[in-house]
Curated annotation (Swiss-Prot):
Function: Catalyzes a cyclopropane ring-opening reaction, the irreversible conversion of 1-aminocyclopropane-1-carboxylate (ACC) to ammonia and alpha-ketobutyrate. Allows growth on ACC as a nitrogen source.
Pfam families: PALP (PF00291)
Name of this chain's protein: 1-aminocyclopropane-1-carboxylate deaminase
E.C. no: 3.5.99.7
SUPFAM superfamilies tied to this protein: Tryptophan synthase beta subunit-like PLP-dependent enzymes (SSF53686)
């Protein structure tokens, strides 16, 4: 497997820390050791997150092509678009963001706080669109690129989650290689890796990266899309393409993609009571914040799987904290009583 042949533009601080979650582990019975790899602390660019790791492999292509405008898309509280806006500002590029109405959540300040607020502060051209949730290629995004061209600019397309870009999975192949190096220092290997999945390239990259040492099926995706069949298919497709790109040396199959579908509801962007309880529990046990859209759902999944005994006693489980906390302000009503 050869990741080094792909150019990478550094946007992160370096390897992200692995933090033992000792109090949470003890609270859940102490039979399973929980750890978190803090992708939410990976960069100084507007709070960073998992998309910043992915963008390190997309940006060299944008620069090589002489593009002057990054064009991306997401929901109103998209972490992706905030990270793209930050990277554009950092590189002195323009940025156009399409923010669609992916979440059925009504709050007077939902489109004015959190991620979208930061994108505006960062200087992005933010365009609200009424279209609902989907993880595929969107007409509104294609129109935004056409608008840039019509104005004489040269757009660089960054799809939702970076996932439909052919290089979108590379960052999290690198994540797996980084974990292996950290495991060598720690003196043990993680038995399971838990990660939130929606557009798919984060888990896809991990599946490929951990397939290199026989752990593809130990990457446990927690679906947050509430469209699990579409998400599973997209993870598999991206993983297969990424495996070919990096020369994994074996085919990725549907059995390599593990996606737990119990925690994505009631729908994308809306948390269940179990997710809200998981957010509070993690915060109060560890001082670590998660969000209602993504990381709260994967935290809910991990906690519930421990409670159900789905991780064997003695397991070491690595929770991938992908970011997302800037969206908390948009859900302040849900936490008005703590």
């Amino acid at each position: 497997m050869n990741l080094q042949r792909f150019p990478r533009h550094p946007l992160t601080f370096g390897p992200t820390p692995i933090q033992p979650l000792k109090r949470l582990s003890a609270h859940l019975g102490g039979q399973v050791e929980l750890y978190a790899k803090r992708e939410d602390c990976n960069s100084g660019l507007a709070f960073g997150g998992n998309k910043t790791r992915k963008l390190e492999y997309l940006i060299p292509e944008a620069l090589a092509q002489g593009c002057d405008t990054l064009v991306s898309i997401g929901g109103i509280q998209s972490n992706q678009t905030r990270q793209v806006a930050a990277v554009a500002a950092h590189l002195g590029m323009k940025c156009v963001l399409v923010q669609e109405n992916w979440v059925n959540y009504s709050d007077a300040v939902y489109d004015r706080v959190g991620n979208i607020e930061m994108s505006r502060i960062l200087g992005a051209d933010v365009r609200l669109d009424a279209a609902g949730f989907d993880i595929g290629i969107r007409p509104s995004w294609e129109q935004a690129m056409a608008d840039v061209r019509a104005a004489g600019g040269k757009p660089f397309p960054i799809p939702a989650g970076c996932s439909e870009h052919r290089l979108g999975g590379l960052g999290f192949v690198g994540f797996a290689e980084e974990v292996r190096a950290q495991e060598a220092e720690l003196g043990f290997k993680f038995d399971y890796i838990v990660v939130c999945s929606v557009t798919g390239s984060t888990q896809a990259g991990m599946v490929v990266g951990f397939a290199a040492d026989g752990r593809a099926e130990r990457v446990i995706g927690i679906d947050a899309s509430a469209k699990p069949e579409q998400t599973h298919a997209q993870i598999l497709r991206i993983a297969q393409n990424t495996a070919e790109l990096v020369g994994l040396g074996r085919e990725i199959t549907a059995q390599d993609v593990v996606l737990d579908t119990r925690y994505g509801g009631p729908e994308y962007g809306l948390p269940s009571e179990g997710t809200l309880e998981a957010i509070r529990l993690c915060a109060r046990q560890e001082g670590m914040l998660t969000d209602p859209v993504y990381e709260g759902k994967s935290m809910h999944g991990m906690i519930d799987k421990v409670k159900r005994g789905e991780f064997p006693a003695g397991s070491r489980v690595l929770y991938a904290h992908l970011g997302g906390v800037p969206a908390l302000n948009a859900y302040s009503f849900l936490f008005r009583n703590g």
